Amino acid sequence: MMAGSLPDQQIDLRGISCPKNFIRCRLALEALDVNQLLQVDLDCGEPEEMVVSGLREAGHRVEIYSKEATWLRLMVTCGGG
């Protein structure tokens, strides 16, 4: 992500279990155009592993923007997948 880039959409999925969090990410990305940014706040652990790998497999670029003790913030660049 370029410094200073603001996300086009933001979703907070902390406390949302798998696979609901992944499905919500996919739905949010479907509403975006290619190269738009989605900010995702997500719990660490299984949600992080499942969502990050699933979105990458679907053709989106996923970067960990910041990480706290129990959650992290992802910046997902829509790949149109």
Write out the residue ranges for each language-model feature:
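Charged, low-complexity, helix/coiled-coil-prone segments
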Residues: M1, D33, E68-A69
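Detector for methionine-enriched segments
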Residues: M1-M2, M50, M75
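Right-handed parallel beta-helix/beta-solenoid
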Residues: M2-L13
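Intrinsically disordered, low-complexity regions
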Residues: S5, I16, E46, G80-G81
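Intrinsic-disorder/low-complexity, polar/charged segments enriched in Ser/Thr/Lys/Arg/Asp/Glu/Gln
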Residues: D8, L37-Q39, W71-R73
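Amphipathic, hydrophobic secondary-structure cores in small proteins
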Residues: L13-I64
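C-terminal edge-of-domain segments
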Residues: R61-G81
